[in-house]
Amino acid sequence: MVSTHIGFPTETVIVFIALSVGAIFIDLFMHRDDKPISLKSAALWSVFWVVVAMAFAGFLYIHHGAEVASLFVTGYALEKVLSVDNLFVMMAIFSWFAVPDRYRHRVLYWGIIGAIVFRGIFVAIGTSLLSLGPYVEVVFAIIVAWTAVMMLKSGDDDDEIEDYSQHLAYRMVKRFFPIWPKLRGHAFLLNQKEVDAELAKPENSDVTIGRGKKAALYATPLFLCVAVVELSDVMFAFDSVPAIIAVSREPLIVYSAMMFAILGLRTLYFVLEALKQYLVHLEKAVIVLLFFIAAKLGLNATDHIWHHGYSIAATTSLYVVLGVLALGILASVMFPGKPESEEKGS
């Protein structure tokens, strides 16, 4: 059997690529329509991704032994634990952009492309790029805390945004490249012909576009949302990649463990999102967790920079997340109030 430069036979690399790409294709094909994902569907797809990961672990066990399979499962579990915070940051991002439920799966799964690329880069170069981590975390801690404040102020207001002209992300980015300030279906980019057609509509008579010049392509608010999701993936990679590299220095083990965990976490996001319809106080718990995550990022980052000795360990973070979620669920059971579906119908 021919071995690759990463220490595994070509057959193993092919199995990993075929299994992961095939599973992504199945997932995307089954969710090709822009429809909100139900709790049952989200739960089943979460199980699907766990089964796919364990199938690869089984292959490693049969062909490379128990030790290699154990390293993969350890890395997989570690990535899951370290990326739990990312679930709540995703909620914050979607809340900030007021992305309709029907487009969220598309946004998250296009975000996978960035995750695949950036995690691959981090694994390839080891820890040299990770030295930037603390500075990225400080910036992201501020953004997460600010988003939590915005969610707290908005309360139960989940209305879609018709025009993003005053949105902070739009105002920050429009000076660099042209943006169409409204959602146009699930499109991420529009060409000049499509933009001209939109500008011809009476309701868009007062719309101004980015730099005010004609361009080959225009980004939409959905594209900006994908970019922020990508940024969150990169930011959390600064935490998880060194931890998993500490488990195994074998690139394929590290990369495959991260990828299967990330793919599964995205479906777990939809489980949490669907539960919000039934657990009316879960969103309050999410807001509390966002403040906690911001504090954790800030403490850990500044400890790396200034060595003040205060930080929050991954295990402590997991206990806090589980505890706050449990309180949110308990409060929803004891004080159910009105589910969102009833409030919208009344």
Swiss-Prot record:
Q: Which organism is it from?
A: Serratia marcescens
The UniProt entry, under NCBIfam families, shows: R_switched_Alx
Gene Ontology cellular component terms for the protein in this record: plasma membrane
In its UniProt record, which GO terms are filed under biological process?
Answer: response to tellurium ion
Q: Which InterPro entries match?
A: Integral_membrane_TerC, Integral_membrane_TerC_rswitch
Q: What is its main location?
A: membrane
Q: What is the lineage of its organism?
A: Bacteria, Pseudomonadati, Pseudomonadota, Gammaproteobacteria, Enterobacterales
What the protein does?
Could conceivably alter the intracellular level of tellurium in a manner leading to resistance. Alternatively its presence in the membrane may provide a barrier to entry of the tellurium ions.
Family membership noted in the UniProt record: Belongs to the TerC family.
* Keyword flag Ribosomal protein: no
Q: Write the protein's name.
A: Tellurium resistance protein TerC
Ranges annotated as spanning the membrane: 6-26, 42-62, 81-101, 110-130, 132-152, 227-247, 252-272, 286-306, 316-336
Which locations, inside or outside the cell, does it occupy?
A: Cell membrane
Give the signal peptide, or none. Answer: none
The membrane-topology field of this record reads: Multi-pass membrane protein
Q: Does the keyword Signal apply?
A: no
The alphabetized UniProt keywords are: Cell membrane, Membrane, Plasmid, Tellurium resistance, Transmembrane, Transmembrane helix
